[in-house]
Curated annotation (Swiss-Prot):
Cellular component terms (Gene Ontology): ribonucleoprotein complex; ribosome
Subunit details: Part of the 30S ribosomal subunit. Contacts proteins S5 and S12.
Protein name: Small ribosomal subunit protein uS8
InterPro entries: Ribosomal_uS8 (IPR000630), Ribosomal_uS8_CS (IPR047863), Ribosomal_uS8_sf (IPR035987)
Organism of origin: Stutzerimonas stutzeri (strain A1501)
Length: 130
């Protein structure tokens, strides 16, 4: 069976691993997943990530906890294959009044909503993190 939405699979694996209090979660790697992991690490939501393997690359994400609780409280897919969500720079959503971040795929790469506003670009809102 082919995977219809690899990014949703990635987010679900992260949520499930955090509920099971795992320290590392692995999944098949892709360019988009690595870009999202890079943004999550830059924002401090994960401890790190690593891509290993040549034939079938695997993405391993090291999860982050604070006082025994996961750092990521909420991880939601916004744009999905059946209903893409494209927003201009003025329409980019603020997550919980600016406390969380939206991850946006722009023509300048995958970045947070704050970085997209600073660059003056809109794009596809991939997911929200709080």
């Amino acid at each position: 069976m082919s995977m219809q939405d690899p990014l949703a699979d990635m987010l679900t694996r992260i949520r499930n691993a955090q509920m099971a209090e795992k320290s590392v979660v692995s999944m098949p790697s892709s360019t988009l997943k690595v870009a999202v992991a890079n943004v999550l690490q830059g924002e401090g939501y994960i401890a790190g990530y690593q891509v290993s393997g040549d034939v079938k690359p695997q993405l391993s994400i090291e999860l982050k906890y604070f006082e025994g609780r996961p750092v990521i409280e909420e991880l939601k897919r916004v744009s999905r294959p059946g209903l893409r969500q494209y927003k201009s720079v003025d329409q980019l959503p603020k997550v919980r009044g600016g406390l969380g971040v939206s991850i946006v795929s722009t023509n300048k790469g995958v970045m947070t909503d704050r970085a997209a506003r600073a660059a003056g670009v809109g794009g596809e809102v991939l997911c929200t993190v709080f």
